[in-house]
């Protein structure tokens, strides 16, 4: 019985370390994005829906930054409204990606916290199959939240390591 309880305690500690790593990675990515993405510019892009040279420079930096870690699946900047999320930047370059001004309806997890998303409140990560999405508010120069930086972190590598650990 003691061996089983030690294994369980070690496993719980291992899970906590992995969760802390994922949280830390997402926060580091978001903080770096805050250095690149100007909240006041986000408001301007949302209003006029026009891309300029500065827009593309930021977008390319976000794509480059996403590519620095295999665990960072996606970086987006999104403003939530009644109809869904209005995208400013999205680093998903597949057909599933969004462009400036695209509005995507709320998914099931987002719909459950729709009011918090519209208010740009701090929320817990949303869990999807194989990923955790972290929503970190982006503020204007007046310290008013204008959008979220959404960082999608892979949980597949952690799951593989867990299976190896348990195997």
Q: What residue spans do the PLM features occupy?
A:
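Extreme N-terminal signal-anchor transmembrane helix of membrane signaling/transducer proteins, especially
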Residues: 1-12
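Glycine-rich acetyl-CoA-binding "A-motif" of GNAT/NAT acetyltransferases
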Residues: 145
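Short N-terminal helix-loop-first-beta-strand/juxtamembrane motif that initiates sensory/input modules
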Residues: 63-85
């Amino acid at each position: 019985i003691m061996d089983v309880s030690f294994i369980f305690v070690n496993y719980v500690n291992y899970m906590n370390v992995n969760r802390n790593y994922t949280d830390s990675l997402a926060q580091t990515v978001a903080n770096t994005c805050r250095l690149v993405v100007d909240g006041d510019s986000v408001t301007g892009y949302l209003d006029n829906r026009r891309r300029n040279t500065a827009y593309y420079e930021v977008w390319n930096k976000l794509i480059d930054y996403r590519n620095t870690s295999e665990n960072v699946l996606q970086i987006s900047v999104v403003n939530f409204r009644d109809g869904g999320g209005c995208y400013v930047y999205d680093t998903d370059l597949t057909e599933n990606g969004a462009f400036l001004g695209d509005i995507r309806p709320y998914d099931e997890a987002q719909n459950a916290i729709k009011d918090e998303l519209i208010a740009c409140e701090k929320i817990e990560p949303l869990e999807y199959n194989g990923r955790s999405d972290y929503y970190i508010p982006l503020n204007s120069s007046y310290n008013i939240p204008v959008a979220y930086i959404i960082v999608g972190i892979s949980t597949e590598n952690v799951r593989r390591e867990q299976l190896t650990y348990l195997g």
